[in-house]
Regions:
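Generic N-terminal amphipathic, Lys/Arg-enriched alpha-helix
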Residues: 1-22
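A short, well-structured juxtamembrane/interface segment
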Residues: 19-40
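N-proximal short alpha-helices
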Residues: 3, 7, 29, 63-66, ...
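Generic alpha-helical structural signal
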Residues: 5, 9-12, 28-31, 121
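Residue-level detector of alpha-helical secondary structure
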Residues: 10, 29, 33-36, 58, ...
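Polar helix-capping/helix-linker motif
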Residues: 17-20, 24, 76, 180
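Glycine-rich phosphate-binding loops that contact phosphosugars or nucleotide phosphates
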Residues: 40, 45-184
Length: 184
């Protein structure tokens, strides 16, 4: 059994090893890309499943409200279930990206605590085919899967098998990005 002290120590340990150079690289890419494409529909698509989807929605809200960045998540339940029914769960995100005319001027943020979500991997592959930029955060077994789908190598692997630790660390990373992009 894990004590709360052990749990908090684990979170602190994982936060202390966040590679700030990767986070800074993502902020730099977002700033550059957003300035380059301002006025032409530059958007940030954020995808995840379960708790990662909740994080995606939270960060999307902050990017829209605090940073004036057009951020989207697939949080429309009727659309999600329709796409899942028609195209399968593994293809639903790609179909959503197509409906929203995702292109090379857009940016994808992918969050997968398990590190093996097929729909997230397909979204990354689709993003690569569109020549767009990506940033991924993943945990657990993703260490051996996700890097091959992150063609521009902007990713962070959270080396834990605890969903709570992965999700909290993911959210801290993304809040760090938001804080770096806030427009006063």
């Amino acid at each position: 059994m894990v004590t709360t002290t052990d749990y908090f120590d684990s979170i602190q340990q994982h936060v202390s090893v966040i590679p700030s150079d990767v986070v800074d690289k993502v902020v730099k890419i977002w700033r550059h890309e957003y300035q380059k494409h301002v006025g032409v529909g530059k958007r940030v698509f954020i995808v995840g499943n379960g708790g990662s989807c909740a994080i995606a929605e939270h960060i999307s809200t902050d990017l829209n409200k605090r940073c004036k960045v057009k951020a989207l998540t697939l949080s429309n339940n009727s659309l999600l279930t329709a796409l899942t029914n028609d195209y399968g769960q593994e293809n639903a995100l790609v179909e959503w990206m197509k409906i929203n005319h995702f292109d090379k001027t857009d940016f994808l943020v992918a969050i997968s605590s398990s590190g093996k979500s097929k729909n997230i991997l397909r979204a990354l592959e689709y993003t690569h085919n569109c020549l767009a930029s990506t940033f991924s955060i993943f945990g657990m077994s993703g260490k051996n899967i996700f890097p091959q789908y992150n063609y521009d190598h902007s990713y962070i692997h959270i080396d834990s098998f605890n969903y709570g630790v992965i999700e909290l660390t993911s959210e801290i990373i993304l809040h760090g990005i938001v804080e770096s992009l806030v427009i006063e």
